[in-house]
């Protein structure tokens, strides 16, 4: 019998969920969110951390773990539009190829800001600003790009700047909070309804999350070493996340669905 496959992106913001994960009889497959979305639909992955946009688009065929999320109330630091000039005046924007959720959120927010730029999918980092008015980066790439602009890391996250000369950093989660006063849910654990995860796997994920959050400084230091950035920046970053899909997070996910013109009728994993 093939082992049940768990899909995980290699991003710092999900490290508290899997850094201490102990699995027996299961296999882990690492990929970027866009690839994990495809693998879940094809059946190559049984349970995966997937983008919220993907989940909402396919919720009629997917089940949802009821107490897991990757969400933020306010600033996220790792879903950033690096741009030159005011948002309503952006003409060309380069988009990450790694995530559907961040792209959908950016288009929604820029439309509401009165912008109508031409969007192009591009691989790369801040060097793209030589040809584009804005560059959307997510995950570790966004963290490293922000760290490269930062002269030093302040003791408090409230002092982290958002302007570096002519380059501004628009944090999409902050813009969402200003719009809704709700958290933004970036990812959820989803599975195909005909292939729910074994209870032992779900319990292992809960235990790993509990240990990861209890030893968050240790997780942050490990991720900082991996990315080559200041550990204090990673601590500021990881302390912001909400990993339990609580009622405010569900309301935020529902608000995102409504903004996209999609339903929100989740089928939760049976306990």
UniProtKB/Swiss-Prot annotation:
It comes from the Bacteria. InterPro entries: Menaquinone_biosynth, MqnA. Its EC number is 4.2.1.151. Pathway: Quinol/quinone metabolism; menaquinone biosynthesis. Keywords: Lyase, Menaquinone biosynthesis. The keyword Mitochondrion does not apply. It holds the Pfam family VitK2_biosynth. Signal peptide: none annotated. GO terms for biological process: menaquinone biosynthetic process. It catalyses: chorismate = 3-[(1-carboxyvinyl)-oxy]benzoate + H2O. It is an enzyme of class 4 (lyase). The keyword tRNA processing does not apply. One of its GO terms (molecular function) is hydro-lyase activity. Catalyzes the dehydration of chorismate into 3-[(1-carboxyvinyl)oxy]benzoate, a step in the biosynthesis of menaquinone (MK, vitamin K2). Belongs to the MqnA/MqnD family. MqnA subfamily. This is Chorismate dehydratase. It comes from Thermus thermophilus (strain ATCC 27634 / DSM 579 / HB8). The lineage of its organism: Bacteria, Thermotogati, Deinococcota, Deinococci, Thermales.
């Amino acid at each position: 019998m093939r082992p049940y496959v768990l899909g995980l992106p290699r991003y710092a913001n999900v490290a508290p969920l899997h850094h201490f994960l102990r699995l027996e009889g299961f296999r882990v497959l690492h990929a970027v969110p866009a690839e994990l979305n495809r693998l879940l639909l094809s059946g190559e992955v049984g349970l995966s951390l997937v983008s919220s946009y993907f989940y909402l688009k396919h919720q009629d065929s997917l089940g949802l773990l009821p107490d897991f999320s990757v969400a933020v109330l306010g600033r996220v630091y790792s879903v950033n539009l690096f741009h030159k000039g005011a948002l309503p005046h952006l003409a060309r924007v380069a988009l990450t190829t790694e995530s559907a959720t961040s792209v959908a959120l950016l288009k929604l927010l820029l439309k509401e800001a009165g912008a109508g730029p031409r969007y192009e999918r591009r691989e790369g980092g801040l060097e793209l600003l030589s040809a584009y008015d804005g560059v959307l980066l997510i995950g570790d790439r966004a963290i490293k790009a922000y760290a490269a602009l930062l002269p030093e890391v302040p003791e408090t996250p409230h002092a982290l700047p958002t302007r570096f000369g002519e380059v501004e950093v628009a944090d999409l989660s902050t813009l969402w909070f200003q719009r809704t006063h709700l958290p933004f849910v970036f990812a959820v654990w989803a599975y195909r309804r005909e292939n729910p995860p074994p209870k032992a796997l779900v319990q292992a994920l809960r235990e790993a999350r509990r240990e990861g959050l209890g030893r968050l400084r240790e997780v942050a230091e490990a991720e900082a070493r991996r990315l080559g950035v200041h550990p204090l920046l990673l601590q500021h970053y990881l302390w912001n996340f909400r990993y339990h899909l609580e009622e405010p997070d569900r309301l935020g996910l529902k608000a995102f669905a409504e903004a996209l013109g999609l339903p929100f009728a989740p089928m939760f994993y049976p306990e």
